[in-house]
UniProtKB/Swiss-Prot annotation:
UniProt-listed HAMAP family: UPF0259
Organism taxonomic ancestry: Bacteria, Pseudomonadati, Pseudomonadota, Gammaproteobacteria, Enterobacterales
Pfam families: UPF0259
Entries under InterPro entries matching the protein: UPF0259 (IPR009627)
This protein's name: UPF0259 membrane protein BU276
Keyword Membrane: yes
Disulfide bridge positions per record: none
Family listed: Belongs to the UPF0259 family.
UniProt keyword annotation of Membrane present: yes
Source organism superkingdom: Bacteria
GO CC terms: plasma membrane
Swiss-Prot/TrEMBL keywords: Cell membrane, Membrane, Transmembrane, Transmembrane helix
Membrane disposition: Multi-pass membrane protein
Originating organism: Buchnera aphidicola subsp. Acyrthosiphon pisum (strain APS) (Acyrthosiphon pisum symbiotic bacterium)
Amino acid sequence: MPITVNKLRHDTHHFFYKKIGAIFFISIFATFMNILIDMFIKPDMHIVSIMENNKFINTSSLLEFIQNMNLNEKHELLKYSILKIMESLISKTTLLGSIIILISVVSEPKKKSIVSSIRTFFLFFPSLFILNFLTTFIIQIGFMLLIIPGILLSIILSLSPIILFFKKNRLLDSIRLSMYISWKYIKIIGPGVLFWMCGKFILTMLLAHFSLINKNVLFLISNISMNILFSILIIYLFRFYMIFLRS
């Protein structure tokens, strides 16, 4: 079966509208999990206010800001940053794992029970979390160097969570295969990832102009919308990999 962008777009559109209720529920659940973790973190409000009120133009301005901190403030900033990274990874892994399990359950001819699906999710979660940490770290290094390497790394590593699901806990193999397959089919994988990135950018720009809306409500809308966008990307990539395995 030939793999085309139009075919994947049609299949993604069909699956999204068929399972729109479940996707919305997962997106909302991941958002509320993010909020709950944020409540338990309880960071130093002085550090949070400093971070929110300072607009860093570049890396040097951020480094200068950190250098002017006292030792206690640096320690609190480090702790806050680590906790926020963990929060983001847990939320992303929950969303990613849930959507992958949802697609796999719907795609299988033999229907799985809810208990079986939850069990699969919890078995999959630890390895997916580690993979997310590794790929996020690699991609962020790419963005720190230049924008183009960051985008390219986002594309070639995008299949790794889906390959991991099929390969069953083989992290390095998942990353290696993702790089090989995504590079070979970059004209098909690329548009999906770029659509997601552009969607995130446009959504961020639009929501930034809604200054009259309550900050917490805006955060909720933003997170749910971003989660839905990411879910669409995962559906697109999962469908690609299913067709790839059959071809």
